[in-house]
């Protein structure tokens, strides 16, 4: 019987997760959330958080019910909120509608919620199950989770290379290593991240626009790492619509900083150990304070090396083209000194692969600390969570 319920719970939670994805790129800095209302094994209502500041998933779900929700089961990918923000508490609405049971994929780590919504439901006599498809829910909102708990942006390093690890020929020619399908996918990816980061070298070499160029997607904030302010004022990025932020140092020219500021460019100054080098770790805090919850890192080998050395990269997505470029002097993916020994190499986990057009795409998470990995491995299974389903708290407890 328990296994039958687990199958049913996973079925409807999967649907809720599918709905949540529809809010991608539109709800930040809030999470993507989906909700499904089920009665007698049938879906009678669906909804998702569509846009920041708009009705939450539960509200939209109840707004589209096809019959009386009393006695139904609500599946929601994130714990219902219990506080007044831009919208009233969703937990109160769930209680008001007479739902018998609520299945939650994961607790909300936001200190304003953090279990309070679940407790409110239990105190109202509602059965609550927490943790069904939690891993999938956490991955969906990985950006939100880091931003709300560590107050730093989630960083994805994206790059394209040949099969032998080259990002360009020895002449500098790199158009195009990745296939058209991959390039189109990258424009969609840009719209899913709040900021896009490159180094001064990329601006000087390619003079890119750094826009999403996909209908319906919001252009990212352009973040340029330039310790000496070597990028010219006439660069395309400074004359495109949208926001620009430059990460620089006190070694940069004060007059040029003022000129950029007069053009509407935000300046963040953080000095690294070497003169003219940007302290990327400190810069992440400054970017978070400006509302940057996520960054797509598209810089070259030098910036990539600095980012990995600073420990700011959370995830990688590498497009590998079926070609061999060769050449000792042809640039590779990561610059810098590199790992001195194999045990010191950066390790990746949860590796996934897929084909995008002719390119092999590898996506994985950067392994941070052993204690984080251990915490992940000890997370309870769906069966454990179902066995631990608690009785509702008594009224007034």
Where are these regions (language model features)?
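Short capping loops/turns at secondary-structure boundaries
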Residues: 110-114, 130-133, 148-152, 175-179
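Generic structural signal for helix capping and beta-alpha/helix-loop junctions
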Residues: 111-112, 138, 304, 326
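Proteins enriched for Cys/Gly/acidic motifs involved in redox and nucleic-acid/cofactor modification
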Residues: 26-27, 54, 118, 132-160
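Zn2+-dependent cytidine deaminase-like catalytic core
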Residues: 37-136, 221, 241, 245, ...
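Enzymes that bind and transform nitrogen-containing heteroaromatic metabolites
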Residues: 2-23, 28-30, 46, 69, ...
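Residues that form generic nucleotide/phosphate-binding pockets
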Residues: 19, 64, 140-143, 147, ...
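Helix-turn-helix
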Residues: 34
